[in-house]
């Protein structure tokens, strides 16, 4: 079903561009991933990287369908939907990764630093306002799953926008734990979990209505999925897997607003 040997949420798949006239996708061409746009009928395929030489993924269109973002050779770029006015977001760091548009399309969230030592950053869609949003306190930024059969030994644990775009959820080291945090765009941090020693939380995924958040949690050596009510921080366990299994990357099912 895919030519990408490491399937993840940031590799991207086929996605609709706002306006309903085009689709975005990342084909492998000569072993190199490229950000492409095409018409709904599959015609008029265009590489929006402006001939960039790097391996590109983390690809997505802004909510209004006018801009795209992606990282190429671990540097983040923004351009118009047709690939024009390509802009390199220069952080000064060698590892910039996994850009995500805010729900209103004003901001871009991504991680920046070095491999295994990164932090969440934000920048405006015009390339201004770049700043570090929070500190992971040395957390490597990926969850290992060596006890579960898989081609790779880890899965990136990257931050996520809140439903209203006013804050970001992320995981960071706190003592011997990796806990779940929320930070507003002006840098106010709230710790959402306070767990027994050795607990590792990962993959925060807020609900579309902003009332709950899904996440993974490794306690007693087994990775399970949990849901938390953000109003009072109460949580409930969703999976009950046995040793040798692990649950990761939770997703909310879309619900139509139509009756």
Residue ranges and their predicted role:
Residues 1-259:
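Sequence signature of WD/YWTD-type beta-propeller architectures
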């Amino acid at each position: 079903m895919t030519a990408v040997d490491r399937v993840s949420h940031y590799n991207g798949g086929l996605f609709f561009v706002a306006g309903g006239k085009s689709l975005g996708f990342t084909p492998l061409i000569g072993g190199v991933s490229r950000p492409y746009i095409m018409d709904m009928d599959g015609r008029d395929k265009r590489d929006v990287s402006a001939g960039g030489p790097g391996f590109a993924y983390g690809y997505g269109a802004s909510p209004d369908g006018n801009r795209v973002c992606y990282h190429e050779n671990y540097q983040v770029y923004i351009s118009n939907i047709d690939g024009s006015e390509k802009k390199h977001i220069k952080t000064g760091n060698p590892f910039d990764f996994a850009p995500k548009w805010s729900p209103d399309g004003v901001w871009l969230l991504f991680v920046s630093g070095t491999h295994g030592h990164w932090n969440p950053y934000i920048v405006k869609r015009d390339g201004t306002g770049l700043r570090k949003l929070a500190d992971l306190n040395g957390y490597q930024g990926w969850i290992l799953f060596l006890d579960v059969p898989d081609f790779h030994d880890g899965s990136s644990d990257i931050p996520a926008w809140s439903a209203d775009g006013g804050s970001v959820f992320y995981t960071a080291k706190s003592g011997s734990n990796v806990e779940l945090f929320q930070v507003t765009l002006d840098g106010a941090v709230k710790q959402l979990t306070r767990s027994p020693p050795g607990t590792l939380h990962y993959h925060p995924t807020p609900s579309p209505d902003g009332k709950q958040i899904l996440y993974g949690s490794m306690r007693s050596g087994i990775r399970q999925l949990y849901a938390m009510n953000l109003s009072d921080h109460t949580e409930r366990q969703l999976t009950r897997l046995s040793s040798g299994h692990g649950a990761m990357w939770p997703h909310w099912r879309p619900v139509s607003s139509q009756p």
